[in-house]
Amino acid sequence: MAEEQQNRLQNAIDTMVKSLERDNIRKMQGKMFRCSAQCCEDNGASMQQVHHCIERCHTPLAQAQSLVTNELERFQNRLARCTMHCNDKAKDSFDSGSKEAQVKAQLEGCVIKCAEEHMNLIPSMTKKLKDALAQADK
């Protein structure tokens, strides 16, 4: 059961990332490449000027990718803390004399609850990221 929840959570994250890539990141990549091409077409610019121009073109995309990566890391860390809390509770129950089957059931229930709670965070995280990416694309 916990594995099923984990798969649902992973699929939801994958869907979110694909949506962000398709609707936001890809457009920013196109702008970055067109901007970089314009830099290269400036025959009067020095090699260093062209390089700086290309770097400026790449900055919004790099910031957007960093934003998504950081948000996903925060989400993953929160989920890991939640499951560690479940493990700690299970160990405490086992140490206090609870039967192994009871502890396993408690652990699985706790982990499923973590997954469900974090599944509920995905829509707001998606909106937050889409809003931030739209702002970065201006």
UniProtKB/Swiss-Prot annotation:
Disulphide bridges, residue numbers: none
Domain of life: Eukaryota
InterPro entries in the cross-refs: DUF842_euk (IPR008560)
PANTHER family: PROTEIN FAM136A (PTHR21096:SF0)
Similarity comment: Belongs to the FAM136 family.
UniProt protein name: Protein FAM136A
Species the sequence originates in: Xenopus tropicalis
Gene name per UniProt: fam136a
